[in-house]
């Protein structure tokens, strides 16, 4: 598998990249915007993604978030990222994810090496992320 590297102009507050999600029962695919969140435990999808892919609810689970405890729907789907990362997994539904369709948490990030760096070259700042799975134990391939 190849590493996934994305460069952003300037300083970034939100790491948002393209991804694809797929219904495991129908092979229906959807291109989405993915928000990477190292503070999140699990991958989450918006209600819109669940509806567009016609995902079947497999259960409900209680989660704890900054807004308190709540019960959310559980689904299974396939996640495809640039560089060849593909994983069938349990996802949780959240009513809305600001600026993105899915939230990638540590359950995905933990499958590989994830590096975020901010560089300044010729007085121009640029941010980069690097994701490689399986992990190669690389400390900074972007240096």
Across the structure, where does each feature detected by a protein language model lie?
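Pepsin/retropepsin-fold aspartyl endopeptidases
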Residues: 1-143
């Amino acid at each position: 598998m190849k590493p996934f590297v994305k460069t952003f102009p300037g300083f970034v507050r939100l790491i948002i990249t393209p991804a694809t999600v797929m219904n495991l029962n129908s092979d229906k695919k959807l291109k989405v915007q993915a928000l990477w969140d190292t503070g999140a435990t699990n991958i989450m999808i918006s209600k819109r993604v669940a509806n567009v892919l016609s995902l079947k609810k497999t259960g409900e689970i209680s989660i704890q978030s900054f807004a308190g405890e709540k019960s959310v729907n559980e689904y299974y789907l396939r996640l495809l990222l640039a560089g060849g990362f593909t994983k069938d997994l349990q996802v949780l539904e959240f009513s809305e994810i600001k600026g993105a369709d899915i939230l990638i948490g540590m359950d995905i990030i933990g499958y590989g090496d994830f590096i975020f760096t901010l560089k300044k070259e010729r007085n121009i700042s640029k941010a980069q992320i690097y994701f490689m799975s399986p992990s190669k134990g690389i400390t900074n391939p972007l240096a």
